[in-house]
Amino acid sequence: MKINQPAVAGTLESGDVMIRIAPLDTQDIDLQINSSVEKQFGDAIRTTILDVLARYNVRGVQLNVDDKGTLDCILRARLEALLARASGIPTLPWEDCQ
């Protein structure tokens, strides 16, 4: 999936996450995580994000994640909504990502 434009998903409310994405000129993934629970769950947050990006074959992006103690399922949902917005695809290719 190609990321064509910057996008934002989520809020800064307690129990939620705000994720910002922007395309890069390289194929790197620049991941910046700011979390109130990073010491306890930082590795799990990073693993979840990289798993979703790999599932949709996303490369060449900068991600800024402001986590306020969100659950894993919400993190995945916010990230999938973000990818749809940033790629310009109205619906994600669910069949290809199972």
Swiss-Prot record:
Query: Where does it mainly reside?
Result: cytoplasm
The membrane spanning regions, by residue number, are none
Q: Where in the cell is it found?
A: Cytoplasm
Q: Which InterPro entries match?
A: CitD, Mal_deCO2ase/Cit_lyase_ACP
Pfam families linked: ACP
Residues modified to O-(phosphoribosyl dephospho-coenzyme A)serine: S14
Gene Ontology CC terms, in alphabetical order: cytoplasm
Keyword set, alphabetical order: Cytoplasm, Phosphoprotein
Origin superkingdom: Bacteria
Disulfides per UniProt? none
Function recorded in the entry: Covalent carrier of the coenzyme of citrate lyase.
- Assembly with partners or alone: Oligomer with a subunit composition of (alpha,beta,gamma)6.
Record family assignment: Belongs to the CitD family.
Name of the protein in question: Citrate lyase acyl carrier protein
Q: Which organism is it from?
A: Shigella boydii serotype 4 (strain Sb227)
